[in-house]
Amino acid sequence: MDPKYQRVALNDGHFMPVLGFGSYAPPEVPRNRVVEVTKLAIEAGFRHIDSAYLYNNEEQVGLAIRSKIADGSVKREDIFYTSKLWCTFFRPQLVQPALESSLKKLQLDYVDLYLIHFPMALKPGETPLPKDENGKVMFDTVDLCAIWEAMEKCKDAGLAKSIGVSNFNRRQLEMILNNPGLKYKPVCNQVECHPYLNQSKLLDFCKSKDIVLVAHSALGTQRHKLWVDQNSPALLEDPVLCALAKKHKRSPALIALRYQLQRGVVVLAKSYNEQRIRENVQVFEFQLTSEDMKVLDDLNRNFRYVVMDFLVDHPDYPFSDEY
């Protein structure tokens, strides 16, 4: 089997490719560019495509996937597609319609994975970040277990092959796992994870529960000003990472991606640069030594790029706990 297509078994019997393409692009990127780069990613060897309602690009990503199926490059079952339920649809009766709306945009019959994007409910409606007259984001209170039960119904209906969560901390995961009516465990928890925030405790916890950790922002984010402090350190310029890159004759990005794969983490690589998209698939062509891994572990400083500070007062804000 081509190493590019390495997959990990999920706790529900499905399989997830260990390298994924993160499709988020800032609003200033033209939407037709999304179609081009998603096609490029599939041509380069990516089989796992990660998107979300919030990214406002599912029509374009769906078009790219369907065109690569139409030209015979891939079959639908070769592609592992992830979408995410946004926080303004956190009412049990809104969950399946939200997924159906994503499927309509994608023009696909099912998603391979549907995630709860963040554990924080916002006021229901069509505005992704609903604000009051003072410009404060409007929260909602819900029982996350009731939302999870609605996710389970999406799986039963065949609209999502697998279901999981994103940006949940240990306490929030345990709440779902301990729900007396639990039918399906989350297959994964997708969280920010990179050498500056290696999530070792959360990773150990997830492994103990047979939940896959998926790393977003694995290259330190695109530093989009809505989400990321512009003074935050640039991960890919880290001297230790750059020294390892030089040693292996690879880019710092490849070292950061390889680090995750060797820890048993599924990693998402986000790039809209054609050369880097092709380069990121080379992550299967080399290995880091145990000494290299230790050096990378030592870079951890529990530094989070995506803090979502405008939601810090939310009762379900996930990042105040240690992990």
UniProtKB/Swiss-Prot annotation:
Name of protein: Aldo-keto reductase family 1 member C4
GO terms assigned for molecular function: 5-alpha-androstane-3-beta,17-beta-diol dehydrogenase (NADP+) activity; androstan-3-alpha,17-beta-diol dehydrogenase (NAD+) activity; androsterone dehydrogenase [NAD(P)+] activity; chlordecone reductase activity; estradiol 17-beta-dehydrogenase [NAD(P)+] activity; testosterone 17-beta-dehydrogenase (NADP+) activity; testosterone dehydrogenase (NAD+) activity
Control of this protein's activity: Potently inhibited by benzbromarone, 3',3'',5',5''-tetrabromophenolphthalein (TBPP) and o-cresolphthalein.
PANTHER family: ALDO/KETO REDUCTASE
UniProt keyword list: Cytoplasm, Lipid metabolism, NADP, Oxidoreductase
Origin superkingdom: Eukaryota
Cross-referenced CDD domains: AKR_AKR1C1-35
Physiological role: Cytosolic aldo-keto reductase that catalyzes the NADH and NADPH-dependent reduction of ketosteroids to hydroxysteroids. Liver specific enzyme that acts as an NAD(P)(H)-dependent 3-, 17- and 20-ketosteroid reductase on the steroid nucleus and side chain. Displays the ability to catalyze both oxidation and reduction in vitro, but most probably acts as a reductase in vivo since the oxidase activity measured in vitro is inhibited by physiological concentration of NADPH. Acts preferentially as a 3-alpha-hydroxysteroid dehydrogenase (HSD) with a subsidiary 3-beta-HSD activity.
Summary of the tissues where the protein is detected: High expression in liver. Also expressed in kidney.
Organism listed in the record: Macaca fuscata fuscata (Japanese macaque)
Transmembrane segments: none
This protein's pathway: Steroid metabolism
Residues at which NADP(+) binds: 20-24, 50, 166-167, 190, 216-221, 270-280
